[in-house]
């Protein structure tokens, strides 16, 4: 049974107004694209320049999807001069939003070919909106298609509040405006990144160059933007991502290479353990940089898969760094496991444990919470046969904090026995913005990594006020 201290009970008895006042010092996040008031600590993650793929143009336009928004872009458009090979990974939530249903069907119909753009609105998820919601998603695509002189060539994404219909007339009337604003500059890409944001405090945009073994003299480009700060947990979370490349990736190779990358990036992060209705990560390749077409089973395929996985990991980590109420970026690494599946499940369980996350926020070296999460991560559900969890052997288990400044790890548990923890050293490590929790299972040679953040008072404030 959980007990409460007298202090805690007195706080629970406080009038609502007093409780609100006690958190009044916490800066609130506006539910819309980030403004000029980007936190100083986050500005370092916003690029000041970039190198963008040939043939793609983008824009961000103010529509006012939420009536309260009159100043920030909330409609994003990406187009390609030529048809693209395309693939997407979608949420596994059973209540899939209308744009997810629409876009999945489109890619199946087109065989991952002939896609020429993506249209995205923020401010309304168009989720759990019935037949009318599907019609609205189709209207968004048709409006963009009309601007391009195409048909069935546009992927649709939406993000925002669930259960509300889109102001569809307002959106489709502004799609031509979004089309006329298209451009390929860094500022255009950054504006698009801002347009897909909701509770994000900064736009998330990355661009890189790379080469492939068969065309060492050709410089390829890849660029992508993503959004997400809450309701983040595989598979996937309120997370939208658009990645574009001018490399010639075949339509048959694109789905597998994207799934491989997403499993090791966007599906390896968690903010709060909630999986959204709208998650979509789409990859478009128009081949305009030239070179040999990339197909499965070739050195080019392996090389591009590595490039995309690293690129996707960088994008996914930006989401964690902008987690709602987050003050820390935490890497959870589980090694020496009997299986990769077990390592992933353990890392995921630790990463989403509220007790672990609040201890990290409080700078409390409470390794018992880490061990507790490890211990229950693989146990059977009550209705299932008992699993003795051979992947976890208590006397083989080790837990450490690993500083990111290159200094020695702080051992907390060694072979199932607690260490005499240097609390002063632990406090120094927990004071850092970045830290790693390392769990060695001692039962094999497999491993997995997750990225998460802490929980602060601000997380409650943001989500308590989400619809207001």
Swiss-Prot record:
It catalyses: N(2)-acetyl-L-ornithine + L-glutamate = N-acetyl-L-glutamate + L-ornithine; L-glutamate + acetyl-CoA = N-acetyl-L-glutamate + CoA + H(+). The record marks 159-160 as: Involved in the stabilization of negative charge on the oxyanion by the formation of the oxyanion hole. Pathway: Amino-acid biosynthesis; L-arginine biosynthesis; L-ornithine and N-acetyl-L-glutamate from L-glutamate and N(2)-acetyl-L-ornithine (cyclic): step 1/1; Amino-acid biosynthesis; L-arginine biosynthesis; N(2)-acetyl-L-ornithine from L-glutamate: step 1/4. Its EC number is 2.3.1.35, 2.3.1.1. Keywords: Acyltransferase, Amino-acid biosynthesis, Arginine biosynthesis, Autocatalytic cleavage, Mitochondrion, Multifunctional enzyme, Transferase, Transit peptide. Residues 1-23 form a transit peptide. One of its GO terms (molecular function) is L-glutamate N-acetyltransferase activity. Substrate binds at residues 198, 227, 238, 324, 463, 468. GO terms for cellular component: mitochondrial matrix. It is found in: Mitochondrion matrix. CDD domains: OAT (cd02152). Belongs to the ArgJ family. Catalyzes two activities which are involved in the cyclic version of arginine biosynthesis: the synthesis of acetylglutamate from glutamate and acetyl-CoA, and of ornithine by transacetylation between acetylornithine and glutamate. This is Arginine biosynthesis bifunctional protein ArgJ, mitochondrial. It comes from Podospora anserina (strain S / ATCC MYA-4624 / DSM 980 / FGSC 10383) (Pleurage anserina). The lineage of its organism: Eukaryota, Fungi, Dikarya, Ascomycota, Pezizomycotina.
